[in-house]
From Swiss-Prot:
Name the record gives this protein: Transcriptional repressor NrdR
Protein function: Negatively regulates transcription of bacterial ribonucleotide reductase nrd genes and operons by binding to NrdR-boxes.
Alphabetical list of PROSITE patterns matching this protein: ATP_CONE (PS51161)
Cofactors (names): Zn(2+)
One GO process term, biological-process aspect: negative regulation of DNA-templated transcription
Molecular function terms, GO-annotated: ATP binding; DNA binding; zinc ion binding
Family matches, as PANTHER family: TRANSCRIPTIONAL REPRESSOR NRDR (PTHR30455:SF2)
Pfam families reported for this sequence: ATP-cone (PF03477), Zn_ribbon_NrdR (PF22811)
Residue ranges, compositional bias (Polar residues): 167-176
Domain ATP-cone, residue spans: 49-139
Family: Belongs to the NrdR family.
Length: 176
């Protein structure tokens, strides 16, 4: 390792420890030429993952973009930021474990949907509506039917019953 002070190429390691939750190694070094000490970090270099979009454009996988999309779908569902981070961590880990360095946006979206299904049915339907580009109520009904058939989570029994509008109209009269 080259010394940042004198550019000598030989140094000795004084101390090594795990850093960044085990994602890197912190090493304290001493230059054999000038005897000054410096710190280095050793990290795993991940090969970037490319996402192939629907229009065949390619862009680098962006964790923050995925997290933002998932967070939007999960607004007001009671899911914590930690749960969302964990979901995105799982998706990213699956991508890193694949031998192929390209993934289609379809595969990425389906991976997210699979994980959302067990966390929140509302978030699942919201994410699916954007990802699958729902065009009408029929698309929502089909997504709900898929959830119901999968049996992965407890769907409210209200979905088994036909919808009846029992709300009474409210008439407001304002004094003049």
């Amino acid at each position: 390792m080259q010394c940042p002070f004198c550019q000598h190429t030989d140094s000795r390691v004084l101390e090594s420890r795990s850093a960044e939750a085990g994602q890197s190694v912190r090493r304290r070094r001493e230059c054999l030429q000038c005897n000054r000490r410096f710190t280095t970090y050793e990290r795993i270099e991940f090969v970037p993952i490319t996402v192939i979009k629907r229009n065949q454009d390619r862009e680098l996988f962006d964790r923050s973009k995925l997290l933002k999309g998932v967070a939007t779908a999960c607004e007001k569902t009671g899911l914590t930021a930690l749960q969302l981070e964990s979901l995105v961590d799982d998706v990213e880990a699956e991508l890193q474990q694949q031998a192929v360095r390209e993934v289609t946006s379809t595969e990425l979206g389906e991976s997210v949907l699979t994980k959302l299904q067990s966390l929140s049915e509302v978030a699942y339907v919201r994410f699916a509506s954007v990802y699958r580009q729902f065009r009408g109520i029929r698309d929502f009904v089909e997504a709900l039917d898929q959830l119901k058939e999968s049996g992965d989570g407890p769907l409210p029994s209200v979905l088994d019953e036909p919808y009846e509008d029992t709300a009474q109209p409210t008439i407001m009269i304002s004094p003049q």
